[in-house]
Amino acid sequence: MYDFLRFFPENLPDLGFKSYVFMLEKPKGCGIVIRANSPEELRKKLRGVKRRAIVGIIGKEAVCREAVMRRRVDVILDWEDRELDYATLKLAAEKDVAIELSLSKFLRTEGYKRMHLFERLRQEIMVIRKFDVPFIVTTAAENQYELRTRKQVETFFKFFGAEIPKARLYAQRLVRRYFDENYIMDGFEVEQLSNSGVV
């Protein structure tokens, strides 16, 4: 399983993840974060993405709805104020855009706001399961103190009903799409020819 981080740590301890994807606003990681306040701003910023990298979007509900319809967008990133409606999640399933479910937003909030986030997470997972929406579970850590082990992340989301094997599959597929030269699409890969046994 891969973890998607929002910072570039100096020393990264072994937390049980296969590898890490660094989603940064400055394009020096494996992924690019685009923050937009309107669909028009999103389209303008997407045109500016030249590099081949995983593209994640952070924005209000209208921006997220627009993002799932854009071919260049790979994942809708999670944050405290993200709200995804039923139609956006259904569109994400049709357009193969992953939805990130992150642990760090629960660490940064408390009280009623945290309880509201728990309820929203439960509802999102119900719709994700209903429409088989691609999703990933991550820490989305913005600093060293928000890092958690793979087991902690998986156990947390499993408690709310997330299908962890599917989350692993979607994360692996997303990473392979950009960083595995033998990957074409699900079920199609370039195989290496072996000289032994060929007549």
Swiss-Prot record:
* Gene3D superfamilies per UniProt: Metal-dependent hydrolases
This protein's major location comes to cytoplasm
Report any one BP term from Gene Ontology.
Answer: tRNA 5'-leader removal
Q: Name one GO cellular component term.
A: ribonuclease P complex
What keywords would UniProt list here?
Answer: Cytoplasm, Endonuclease, Hydrolase, Nuclease, tRNA processing
Task: Please give the catalytic activity noted in the UniProt record.
Answer: Endonucleolytic cleavage of RNA, removing 5'-extranucleotides from tRNA precursor
Q: Which domain of life is it from?
A: Archaea
Functionally, this protein is described as follows: Part of ribonuclease P, a protein complex that generates mature tRNA molecules by cleaving their 5'-ends.
For this chain, the family text in UniProt reads: Belongs to the eukaryotic/archaeal RNase P protein component 3 family.
UniProt protein name: Ribonuclease P protein component 3
Its ancestry begins with:
Archaea, Methanobacteriati, Methanobacteriota, Archaeoglobi, Archaeoglobales
